[in-house]
UniProtKB/Swiss-Prot annotation:
One of its GO terms (molecular function) is structural constituent of ribosome. The gene is rplD. One of its GO terms (cellular component) is ribosome. This is Large ribosomal subunit protein uL4. It comes from Shewanella halifaxensis (strain HAW-EB4). Part of the 50S ribosomal subunit. One of the primary rRNA binding proteins, this protein initially binds near the 5'-end of the 23S rRNA. It is important during the early stages of 50S assembly. It makes multiple contacts with different domains of the 23S rRNA in the assembled 50S subunit and ribosome. Forms part of the polypeptide exit tunnel. InterPro entries: Ribosomal_uL4 (IPR002136), Ribosomal_uL4-like (IPR013005), Ribosomal_uL4_dom_sf (IPR023574).
Length: 201
């Protein structure tokens, strides 16, 4: 199959296995959920009444003071006491094997092609790290909500895009399922397309 280059009167021959396969919604959902889960730190932690530092002594005698009876200063109704159902550190990570991950990326790229959301250009960049220059380029292409994928990190492009809302720049190695589906359009250079094909086999 062929992908038409937007900035040149030509087309790029690509593998149908990577850019023309059926959309596997269940697989994409599983990989996206796992990717988001793996980004979680899971370091939230609170202390129960057994773990709070403090004396185990009864604060005052049971009867005769006129105050409510109390057996510990570490109970959950006390300020500085333990938490009733204390949160503990958790490992939220989910295993996704390489075949599943690559399959999900292929499904996403294929769906982007079908929906005309994948824009392929011969090359894309800016001469200086100027947001104004990049904004003018994107406006000329009628792109506001876009992920730009280049073969390798272009510092000028990265710095120029940093202050633009709903614009992000990634190299091929930094592409992930969540970022691909988060943007309205995905702008990819011809060289990056070749690298994606090699990466996804």
């Amino acid at each position: 199959m062929e992908l038409v280059l937007k900035d040149a009167q030509s087309a790029l021959e690509v593998s149908e296995a990577t850019f023309g396969r059926d959309f596997n919604e269940a697989l994409v959902h599983q990989v996206v959920v796992a990717y988001a889960a793996n980004a979680r730190q899971g370091t939230r932690a609170q202390k129960t009444r057994a773990e709070v530092t403090g004396s185990g002594k009864k604060p005052w005698r049971q009867k005769g003071t006129g105050r409510a009876r109390a057996g510990t200063v570490k109970g959950p109704i006390w300020r500085g006491g333990g938490v009733t159902f204390a949160a503990k550190t958790q490992d939220h990570s989910q295993k996704v094997n390489k075949k599943m991950y690559r399959g999900a990326l292929k499904s996403i790229f294929s769906e982007l092609v079908r929906q005309d959301r994948l824009i392929v250009v011969e090359s894309f960049g800016v001469d200086a790290p100027k947001t104004k220059e990049l904004k003018a380029k994107l406006d000329a292409m009628q792109l506001q909500d876009v992920l730009i994928v280049t073969p390798e990190v272009d510092e000028n492009l990265f710095l120029a895009a940093r202050n633009l809302y709903k614009v992000d720049v990634r190299d091929v190695a930094g592409v992930d399922p969540v970022s691909l589906i988060a943007f309205d359009k995905v702008l990819v250079t011809a060289e990056a397309i070749k690298q994606i094909e090699e990466m996804l086999g």
